[in-house]
């Protein structure tokens, strides 16, 4: 069963993504910002198949988190999400470390498909 770490400062988005992804039997852990997520990744020694993170967050944004996670836990696949065009543009420079960027708001089907694609891509690398 794949383990997914979901990071978003908006509780409603975190819970929507968690419920959607749990439908496929994945184990879910959540964090409210990048610093908390990095702490969880470290304490769990990067034992996650996927990091699904919002880009715009307080304390540590998703891009800083993605860079740190890719450096410290290169086996963890990274999937970004944002509702802002400028943040999506910032993320375009991360194609070497991030599988894709999901545009918010998204449907349950959208996030399930994006996660399935990212997990499949992670297994093939």
Model-derived features: positions:
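Hydrophobic/aromatic residues positioned on beta-strands within the core alpha/beta folds
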Residues: 81-82
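C-terminal output helix
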Residues: 106-119, 123
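Acidic, metal-coordinating helix/loop segments flanking the phosphotransfer/catalytic sites
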Residues: 30-50
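Receiver (REC) domain active-site loop signature in two-component systems and cognate sites
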Residues: 57
